[in-house]
């Protein structure tokens, strides 16, 4: 009986590893050809019960390796920029800019999948390709391997090989959804777009690495 249990566990483990490898390969295949990504987005945060807690719109730009620009519009205006080494977070309402080192935890932020190293997906996430939810849509469910992750699960959805949404859940059961429109892939983006010029008269907070 113990042998049968051990064999069952081994078989399930092997099947899980094969599913993860297949998911990683499929997801990497979709992401590896994306050198730049520009889009408008709508971000909605919901409570565990489904109540809308926050909704913002904005634009993002991403360029490999490691360059990212994110700006939300009023009334919750904020700009986040990284050059791959440090991050600038600008809150106009507070007249404040926070500058911090791009730590491993921050580099695992979901949106940074668009500018990070595709080859590291397998190191950072367990990846499972989901059954087709609707014709032409491909979904992947990612679970972070790190214990200090900012989220528990992340779903990436593609239509016609193009990323259309991200949905993540945290440990409190809250869900944040990102839906992309006006997507442009592999268009030229100057690296100047990923360096933040600090406005005059704002407070600057530099966090230690």
UniProtKB/Swiss-Prot annotation:
GO terms for cellular component: outer membrane-bounded periplasmic space. GO terms for biological process: lipoprotein localization to outer membrane; lipoprotein transport. It is found in: Periplasm. Its main location: periplasm. InterPro entries: LolA/LolB/LppX, OM_lipoprot_carrier_LolA-like, OM_lipoprot_carrier_LolA_Pbac. It comes from the Bacteria. Gene3D superfamilies: Lipoprotein localisation LolA/LolB/LppX. Residues 1-21 form the signal peptide. Keywords: Chaperone, Periplasm, Protein transport, Signal, Transport. Belongs to the LolA family. Monomer. PANTHER family: OUTER-MEMBRANE LIPOPROTEIN CARRIER PROTEIN (PTHR35869:SF1). Participates in the translocation of lipoproteins from the inner membrane to the outer membrane. Only forms a complex with a lipoprotein if the residue after the N-terminal Cys is not an aspartate (The Asp acts as a targeting signal to indicate that the lipoprotein should stay in the inner membrane). HAMAP family: LolA. This is Outer-membrane lipoprotein carrier protein. The gene is lolA.
């Amino acid at each position: 009986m113990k042998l049968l249990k051990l064999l069952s566990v081994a078989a399930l483990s092997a099947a899980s590893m094969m599913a993860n490898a297949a998911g990683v390969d499929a997801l990497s295949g979709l992401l590896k050809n994306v050198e730049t990504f520009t889009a408008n987005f709508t971000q909605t945060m919901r409570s565990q019960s489904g109540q809308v807690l926050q909704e913002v719109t904005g634009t993002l730009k991403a360029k490999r390796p490691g360059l990212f620009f994110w700006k939300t519009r009023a009334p919750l205006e904020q700009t986040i920029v990284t050059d791959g080494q440090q991050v600038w977070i600008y809150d106009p309402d507070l007249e404040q800019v926070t500058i911090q080192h791009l730590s491993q935890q921050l580099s695992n932020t979901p949106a940074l999948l668009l500018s990070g190293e595709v080859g590291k997906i397998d190191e950072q996430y367990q990846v499972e390709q989901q059954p087709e939810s609707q014709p032409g849509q491909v979904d992947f469910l990612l679970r972070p391997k790190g214990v200090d992750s900012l989220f528990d699960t992340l779903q990436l959805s593609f239509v016609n090989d193009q990323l259309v949404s991200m949905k993540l859940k945290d440990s409190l059961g809250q869900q944040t959804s990102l839906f992309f429109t006006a997507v442009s892939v592999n268009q030229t983006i100057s690296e100047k777009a990923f360096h933040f010029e600090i406005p005059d008269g704002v407070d600057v907070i530099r966090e230690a690495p």
